[in-house]
Amino acid sequence: EAAGLLAFPRT
C-alpha cells in the first residue's frame, strides 16, 4: 500500500 509504505516501510 502506498500510504502504508510511508507510515511503516515493510522490508
UniProtKB/Swiss-Prot annotation:
Compartmental location: Secreted
The keyword Secreted is assigned to this record: yes
Keyword terms, alphabetized: Amidation, Neuropeptide, Secreted
Residues bearing PTM Threonine amide: T11
A cellular-component GO term for this protein: extracellular region
GO biological process, one term: neuropeptide signaling pathway
Primary location class: secreted
Keyword Secreted carried by entry: yes
Homology family: Belongs to the periviscerokinin family.
Protein purpose: Mediates visceral muscle contractile activity (myotropic activity).
Name the UniProt record assigns to this protein: CAPA-Periviscerokinin-1
Organism: Pachyphasma brandbergense (Gladiator)
